[in-house]
Amino acid sequence: MIILLLIYNLLALPIIISLSIIFSIFNKKIRKGFLGRLRSISSLKSFNSEKFSDIYWFHSSSYGEYQQVETLIHKLKKSDPNIGIIASFFSPSGFDNVKDDNIDLKIYLPFDFILTSYKALKLIKPKKIFFTSSDFWPSFLFVANNLNITTILTSARYRNSYKIFLNMFDIILCVSENDCQLMKRNIRNNKITVTGNPRYDRILNNLNNAKYKIKSDIKEKNKILILASMWREDNKIIFEDLIDSSLINHFEKIIIVPHEISQKYINYYCSSFEKRNFAYKVIDNYQNFEHLAEKFIIVNRVGFLSKLYLQTSITYVGGGFSKSGIHNIIEPAAASNPVIFGPNFLNSNKLDAQGLINVSGGFSIESFNVFKE
């Protein structure tokens, strides 16, 4: 393990950081993350951790992963308002879009060198560190273990390639009994338990608190299609053929939510509609679709996608034509939407996808022609 960490710190990380510097010149998202990590230690130095009884550090890769621990953070703060919560992120989608009064400090996770991780953890001295899903970093974990800081993995799923990292956690909270049994058979840890998928609690809470809901009979009559978490591949295979087909006439409205909210993608959708003289509207706040005259709606903000499903009748979830795999399909299913997605669902959402397919609530497609059917 020590040898692997040395190779990682002395060879792999410098190469990764060098490439990040180069790519950041051309990619705004990479640049924001890189500059944010440069400021992380300074932010930790300025943070007054002494005024809190204990510090709990939560790390999530992105906005979606943070939502999986959001309920836990709220419960911790409610049970003891004197504790401090630090939330760290890898992606700008998490850092920029998570706005939660329960968080006392929000940062990018510092560069994963052993010395940097040691400096960060000695400054804060957290009582516990929570990692969400699969975004865990070797040096940070190693240092936490050596400083006797309790490390907890939430929303855990077993993958053999993660085995070396899974052995570094003190407590592992699995999303399913199957994952739990695989963990117990393959790693050295007796503190493994099933807590279920925390996304479900959050989904139900969002649905219950949604302001705008359309009754099921109206949803069925006035069909509203939502294309959610759309990647470039989804645009090429589904979106472009859809807007050139007669299928659009079957829908009262069509909502488009890009996976990455950026001006580049918004301009792409706007241009596509303008070329065809289609009326469209770009929205950046949660609102009632019934009050919008335009047929095509482009969503230009994250944070309320799960609530939009209550106003739609059919959902296409993107990612299934890309290497990353499909995104959250439970949210639209919970809102009684049939869910359509591409062929690549062998990621962390595999069990959800297969479960929906088995009960005819989900449909995997390989082309737009199948989508039309």
Regions found by a protein language model. Name each.
Residues S20, S24-L207, I226, M230-R232, ...:
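Active-site and donor-binding regions of nucleotide-sugar-utilizing enzymes
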Residues I124-K128, L292-S324:
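Acidic donor-binding loop of glycosyltransferase active sites
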Residues F169, L310-E373:
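Catalytic binding pocket for nucleotide-activated donors in carbohydrate/polymer assembly enzymes
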Residues T116, S161, Y265, N300, ...:
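Short acidic active-site motifs
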Residues M1-G33:
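Helix-enriched interaction subdomains in cytosolic or periplasmic regions
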